[in-house]
Amino acid sequence: MSSKEIVSNRKALRNYEVLDTVDAGVVLTGTEIKSLRDHGGNLGDAYVTISKGEAWLLNASIAPYRFGNIYNHEERRKRKLLLHRYEIQKLESKVSQKGITIIPLGMFLSRGYVKIRLGCCRGKKAHDKRQTIIAREKQREVESAMKRYR
């Protein structure tokens, strides 16, 4: 079961603390699939809402397919996510907590189908971001010291 990442949301990892992840399928049209295979997607401002027992991806931008004709897709349309009922209920219970939201972390191909990795996230404050940077720099120093003294 190989999976190939085609779109990632690096902004989400910087601005949010990821608490839990889940993979979901996405209902797409043919030109959207072709555009995503050509790396024509952006998840920068995207988020997920749950309404009437269904999960929807909003604000995700998939560029129009360059070889498409008049039947090309809309760039920022609402896209339905394919999840089991218990997964939707689990996400809904987490989102009901204060400060938790569902953010798409990336899209990947799995067995020819486009899947999306969703994360239950909490927003980071400025001091949290600084602490993350400091921890990453310390880890880098430790790794370089270990490499030097091998």
Swiss-Prot record:
What are the UniProt keywords, alphabetically?
Cytoplasm, RNA-binding
Keyword RNA-binding found: yes
Q: Which Gene3D superfamilies match?
A: 2.40.280.10
UniProt subcellular location: Cytoplasm
Q: What does this protein do?
A: Required for rescue of stalled ribosomes mediated by trans-translation. Binds to transfer-messenger RNA (tmRNA), required for stable association of tmRNA with ribosomes. tmRNA and SmpB together mimic tRNA shape, replacing the anticodon stem-loop with SmpB. tmRNA is encoded by the ssrA gene; the 2 termini fold to resemble tRNA(Ala) and it encodes a 'tag peptide', a short internal open reading frame. During trans-translation Ala-aminoacylated tmRNA acts like a tRNA, entering the A-site of stalled ribosomes, displacing the stalled mRNA.
One GO term describing the cellular component: cytosol
Q: What is this protein called?
A: SsrA-binding protein
Stored NCBIfam families: PRK05422.1, smpB
UniProt cross-references to HAMAP family, sorted A to Z: SmpB
CDD domains this protein is in?
SmpB
**Family stated for the protein in its record:** Belongs to the SmpB family.
Q: Which GO terms describe its molecular function?
A: RNA binding
By its UniProt entry, which Pfam families does this protein fall under?
A: SmpB
> What's the domain of life for this entry?
Bacteria
